[in-house]
């Protein structure tokens, strides 16, 4: 196969810059990274200067994703020679163990790293990733809670914990995690939407009211969030049909549901879609409107 430089008429400098761009964007396009990176380290290592080390790491991770253990091991050996004893390189060794499904070896390695450096967040997160890969959600939850006791500001960890609680159907704790996220990210419409979905799933009139409120907030933050729009419709519809709701509450929520249904219809009509599944979705909305005796304007 022709080399990248020949196929695309690019220089090694352009390839190096492309690798840097992928790193900055956190791209996980493993096949491309591996193809470009392997040519760089094979043919231009002497020209790359200190960039060679971060490229070795980048290529190694891509090779693990792609199942190229030979390339991953080559990169790892080069990094070990240059940085003996480095925790970062040890973590890469652990990631290779993970790719080989040698989970116990990886856990032991991460534990040794944490004994030497208890603040090493990367090693902690790798341990959590292993628990999830093994389907040990309860252990992953325990590890994440311990992690968040020390690193309470890690938003990614809070969201990961919320997802794990949702998978375990522990919606009250999932809601708590999402509340933490909304406090620090009040303008993130996706957190509002997910919190609303959790409250909707919990059920009960009070939770449904909260659900409708946060679906509305998600829409306020992003008026193109169709999932939030459908959520607003569903939560308002269920409140309107709840026997514990007052007459005023039912009347208000019939109005909210009607507004949401009209917006859904308009969105589909504006998009000009005619697919069968879209028509079915619209028919379902219309049927629910009829059930609730909502008159569309």
From Swiss-Prot:
Question: Which keywords does UniProt give here?
Answer: Acetylation, Endoplasmic reticulum, Membrane, Repeat, TPR repeat, Ubl conjugation
Quaternary state and interactors? Component of the ER membrane protein complex (EMC). Interacts with WNK1 (via amphipathic alpha-helix region); promoting the ER membrane protein complex assembly by preventing EMC2 ubiquitination.
Gene Ontology BP terms:
protein insertion into ER membrane by stop-transfer membrane-anchor sequence; tail-anchored membrane protein insertion into ER membrane
Residue spans of the TPR repeats: 87-120, 155-188, 192-225
Chief subcellular location equals endoplasmic reticulum
User: Per its record, what are the GO molecular function terms?
Assistant: membrane insertase activity
Q: What is this protein called?
A: ER membrane protein complex subunit 2
Similarity field: Belongs to the EMC2 family.
List the record's Gene Ontology CC terms alphabetically: cytoplasm; EMC complex; endoplasmic reticulum; endoplasmic reticulum membrane; extrinsic component of endoplasmic reticulum membrane
Give the subcellular location.
Endoplasmic reticulum membrane
After translation, how is this protein modified? Answer: Ubiquitinated when soluble in the cytoplasm, leading to its degradation by the proteasome. Interaction with EMC2 prevents its ubiquitination and degradation.
């Amino acid at each position: 196969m022709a080399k990248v430089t020949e196929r695309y008429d690019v220089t090694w400098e352009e390839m190096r810059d492309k690798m840097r761009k992928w790193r900055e964007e956190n791209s996980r396009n493993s096949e491309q990274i591996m193809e470009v990176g392997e040519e760089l380290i094979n043919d231009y290592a002497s020209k790359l200067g200190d960039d060679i080390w971060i490229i070795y790491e980048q290529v190694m991770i891509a090779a693990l994703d792609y199942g190229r253990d030979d390339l991953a091991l080559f990169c790892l050996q080069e990094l070990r020679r240059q940085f003996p004893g480095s925790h970062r390189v040890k973590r890469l060794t652990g990631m290779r163990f993970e790719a080989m499904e040698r989970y116990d070896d990886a856990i032991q390695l991460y534990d040794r790293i944490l004994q030497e450096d208890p603040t090493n967040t990367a090693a902690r997160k790798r341990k959590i990733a292993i628990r999830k890969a093994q389907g040990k959600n309860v252990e992953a939850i325990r590890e994440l809670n311990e992690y968040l006791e020390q690193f309470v500001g890690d938003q990614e960890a809070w969201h990961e914990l919320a997802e794990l609680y949702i998978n375990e159907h522990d919606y009250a704790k999932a809601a708590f995690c999402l509340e933490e996220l909304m406090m620090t990210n009040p303008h993130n419409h996706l957190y509002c939407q997910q919190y609303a979905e959790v409250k909707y799933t919990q059920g009960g009139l009070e939770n449904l009211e909260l659900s409708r409120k946060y679906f509305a907030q998600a829409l306020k933050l992003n008026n193109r969030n169709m999932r939030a729009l459908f959520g607003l419709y569903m939560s308002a519809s269920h409140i309107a049909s709840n026997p514990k709701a007052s007459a005023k509450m039912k009347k208000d929520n019939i109005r909210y549901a009607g507004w949401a249904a009209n917006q859904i219809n308009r969105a589909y009509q504006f998009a000009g879609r005619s697919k069968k599944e879209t028509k079915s979705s619209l028919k379902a909305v219309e049927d629910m409107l009829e059930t609730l005796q909502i008159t569309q304007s």
